Amino acid sequence: MKQFIDFIPLLLFFIVYKTEPRAVDILGNTYMVGGIFSATAMLIISSVVVYGILYLKQRKLEKSQWLTLVACLVFGSLTLAFHSETFLKWKAPVVNWLFAVAFAGSHFIGDRPIIQRIMGHALTLPAAIWTRLNIAWIVFFLFCGAANLYVAFTYQEFWVDFKVFGSLGMTLIFLVGQGIYLSRHLHDTAPNTTKSED
């Protein structure tokens, strides 16, 4: 559910971007709808609304959501202020690389890798497995950042599609791979769990 909520602003961004550019009159003022800049405005507005509602309901936002929101506001505002999509193209790479830095830093700061802090309440795994899993996420974030950067500046006509659906596809593939990897190790901890319940 959380992943779907996080995807809403990006989906609205995509819909507006794909809309044929046209002038729309709102309260006597004329605005252009469609294209990268109106889509960027929609991304900013929808992100503020979505995460604002989440904050009011939960009284907090996760750190990853704060990072996503701040990055959206910063890079989106720069895109509109300078009328240059270059800033927006850097958003996904920077966010992914910041996640990679955070996951890498958790090996040296704190008592557990970040992935264990996120999933540890649901899974019992050896420390070595948690370390490998965390490293896998670091590599994944680095790869996603590099892929987004490459596509954004190499395939101008394709980068928005990749930003929305390519990143989602890579994430789903990675999660499936993670599930397969974890399934090979969960049975190692199952007997211990059963004994403790007895």
UniProtKB/Swiss-Prot annotation:
UniProt entry keywords in alphabetical sequence: Cell inner membrane, Cell membrane, Membrane, Transmembrane, Transmembrane helix
InterPro entries listed in its UniProt record: YciB (IPR006008)
Subcellular location: Cell inner membrane
Topology term for the membrane: Multi-pass membrane protein
GO cellular component, one term: plasma membrane
Main location (coarse class): membrane
Pfam families in the record: IspA
Transmembrane segments: 36-56, 67-87, 90-110, 133-153, 162-182
Function: Plays a role in cell envelope biogenesis, maintenance of cell envelope integrity and membrane homeostasis.
Assigned protein family: Belongs to the YciB family.
Protein name: Inner membrane-spanning protein YciB
Organism: Pseudomonas savastanoi pv. phaseolicola (strain 1448A / Race 6)
